[in-house]
Amino acid sequence: MTIHRFKAFAATFLAFSLILFASGCGGGSNDDRSPIDFTNGATLSGSIDGAPFKIAVPPADQWNGILLMHVHGYRDRARTENEKDNRVAEAAPGGEATEQALVAQGFAVAGSAFSRNGWAVEEGLVDTVNLTEYFKQRFAPPQATVLLGVSMGSVVALKSIELFPDLYQAVIGLCSVGGGATRNFDLALGVLLAYDIMYGLPENFGFPAGISSNFDFDNDFAAEILQQTQVPEGQVGLEFIRLVSNITSEAFAKDLFSLFFFATEALSELIDRAGGSPIQNLNASYSIPDIARIQLEALGFPAGQIVAGMNQGTVFPANPESRSYLVDNADFSGNHNAPVLLMHTIHDGFVLPANQEAYIDLLSSQGRGAQVFGTYVDSVGHCNFTGSQIGASIAAMGKWLAAGIRPTAADFPEALGFDNNHTPAPFPY
């Protein structure tokens, strides 16, 4: 199934799924749809159409009526015979410890591992619907289903409330890709262009003529990036990439390898799915701060020349069909009425904090600003949250749903590491 048809016939798909579930068909290894007695609570795992899942619920009389549907982040898809995909389903971020804590607080939790790894947004949309309907049949219809989307999972979550407004009531987005996938993958092109001008990318990556659809970061590039961090010539070049990408020093040091993984292997995997390259830089304007350029050139590094070379290289168009694939399943219209709570670390070198502001701006531009609230955590690294911080976001959303009270800064105290006065740097290009 392509996401184009999936989007166009979302309502039809959902109705068809309900028919399948009601008849007991289409459930892979979990064809049993009979109700489960959860008087004393229950934990259930299995697989639906090739997607492993896990569900945990509190005793029936202690359930607060909310189903937290965990939507996991990016998982590497095996590229070599020596690799093995992670197919473990987790019903909450952090696995069993978080699951048990949330169940003890009265939440039902569930999560799918999806039927495929990699940039599995298309699969995530379908598999999350399947698991949500499965939960309703085996246990009980929740009063509210909240999508708890982490990193790439936030794309699934934010897209799902547009496609299935009757199925999901709210979203909590952690380290969200709120600016949409096309914008973020286009940013990767800037990283690649800068590196290629300075050092040359691995030949088997195929940049720029035709990026490989089967590139393995660990085997083909990780050692070279490590070496660059250990020699002066590499260090100054990486600093240039940090500057042109508008990433904080702390975040760049923490997320360096994740950034290059995303720009190479994750992009390669996406190209395999999309049937061509979905990224482009035709309207990009690359730059670094003047003071940084002067400092780098004082060290003998030709920062100005490299910036000029990058701007001469804004000639990469996307494959139109591949671009449409990414737009359709991973960019947002903002057309929904659900409350959305977003939380991001201040220093994130993988998914820029500007993503959070982009989503807030999207809804605000449509007069929906009251539907979204964002907060920041003073920590370094992608999705580097504590359990208490995640718990605060869930508690705030619970209050929002129960009483209609939109969160405020008071729900996210400094004592827990929140910074509600932070304004992130904008997208670099």
Regions found by a protein language model. Give the residues of each.
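Gly/Ser-rich "nucleophile elbow"/oxyanion-hole loop immediately N-terminal to the catalytic nucleophile
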Residues: Q62-W63, L131-S151, L167
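Short, surface-exposed "cap/lid" segments of acyl-processing enzymes
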Residues: D49-P52, P58-A101
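Bacterial Sec-dependent N-terminal signal peptides
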Residues: L18-D37
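Primarily recognizes the serine-hydrolase "nucleophile elbow" in alpha/beta-hydrolase
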Residues: A144-M198
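N-terminal cap/lid segment of alpha/beta-hydrolase-fold proteins
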Residues: D31-W63, M310-Q312
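Conserved alpha/beta-hydrolase "acid-adjacent" motif
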Residues: F350-N355
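Short beta-strand/loop motif that positions the catalytic acidic residue
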Residues: L342-H344
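Accessory cap/linker subdomain of secreted extracellular hydrolases
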Residues: R33-I36, V177-D331
